[in-house]
From Swiss-Prot:
<dbReference type="Pfam" id="PF01467">
    <property type="entry name" value="CTP_transf_like"/>
</dbReference>
<keyword id="KW-0547">Nucleotide-binding</keyword>
<keyword id="KW-0173">Coenzyme A biosynthesis</keyword>
<feature type="binding site">
    <location>
        <position position="104"/>
    </location>
    <ligand>
        <name>ATP</name>
    </ligand>
</feature>
<feature type="binding site">
    <location>
        <position position="18"/>
    </location>
    <ligand>
        <name>ATP</name>
    </ligand>
</feature>
<keyword id="KW-0808">Transferase</keyword>
<feature type="binding site">
    <location>
        <position position="42"/>
    </location>
    <ligand>
        <name>substrate</name>
    </ligand>
</feature>
<keyword id="KW-0460">Magnesium</keyword>
<comment type="subunit">
    <text>Homohexamer.</text>
</comment>
<feature type="binding site">
    <location>
        <begin position="129"/>
        <end position="135"/>
    </location>
    <ligand>
        <name>ATP</name>
    </ligand>
</feature>
<protein>
    <recommendedName>
        <fullName>Phosphopantetheine adenylyltransferase</fullName>
        <ecNumber>2.7.7.3</ecNumber>
    </recommendedName>
</protein>
<dbReference type="InterPro" id="IPR004821">
    <property type="entry name" value="Cyt_trans-like"/>
</dbReference>
<dbReference type="GO" id="GO:0005737">
    <property type="term" value="C:cytoplasm"/>
</dbReference>
<feature type="binding site">
    <location>
        <position position="10"/>
    </location>
    <ligand>
        <name>substrate</name>
    </ligand>
</feature>
<feature type="binding site">
    <location>
        <position position="79"/>
    </location>
    <ligand>
        <name>substrate</name>
    </ligand>
</feature>
<feature type="binding site">
    <location>
        <position position="93"/>
    </location>
    <ligand>
        <name>substrate</name>
    </ligand>
</feature>
<dbReference type="GO" id="GO:0015937">
    <property type="term" value="P:coenzyme A biosynthetic process"/>
</dbReference>
Length: 164
């Protein structure tokens, strides 16, 4: 049986934190599905297509280098439902701090109640990427700040183009 993991998020934009999670997650599964959430009530900076392109450009090579299958997709329903539809046995969630942990534990409990066969696997962020949040990256980029320490080069270029 193939071990399929779903790594959900908005990826608006992809950060070095996301990259860190993927570097760890590819060793836990045979196939990693990075699922870009489409929330109709939110106005992301990057379109769904742009976010999918970033995911492919930045994250897919990490999976390939580790010999892990890779897929990027979108979803607009409950994350656990998307995982179930994808045939995933686990959902990958990155943890930066205690606030993330408290929220994610509550979510994991509810998800396990709804779909008992899917486990939530927590991946602790490496020290260097713990402070990185996509929201802060967007704010820094919008004000002309240098985000090169927080995102891959291709994403930094996309942010620069978006705000110029």
């Amino acid at each position: 049986m193939q071990r399929i993991a779903l790594y959900p998020g908005s990826f608006d934009p992809v950060t070095n934190g996301h990259l860190d999670v993927v570097r760890q997650a590819v060793h836990l599964c045979d196939r990693l599905i990075v699922a870009v959430g489409v929330h109709h009530g939110k106005k992301p900076l990057f379109s769904t297509e742009e976010r999918l392109a970033m995911v492919h450009e930045v994250l897919e090579p990490v999976a390939a280098a580790a010999g892990c299958g890779f897929e990027a997709s979108t979803y607009d329903d409950l994350t656990v439902t998307a995982a179930q539809k994808a045939g995933a046995i686990m959902m990958i969630r990155g943890l930066r701090d205690g606030t993330d942990f408290d929220y994610e534990m509550q979510l994991a409990g509810m998800n396990q109640t709804m779909v008992p066969g899917i486990q939530t696997v927590f991946v602790p962020a490496s020290v260097a990427v713990r402070p990185i949040a996509a929201t802060l990256v967007r704010q820094i980029a919008a004000m002309g700040g240098d985000v090169s320490h927080f995102v891959p080069a291709a994403v930094a270029a996309s942010l620069k183009a978006k705000f110029n």
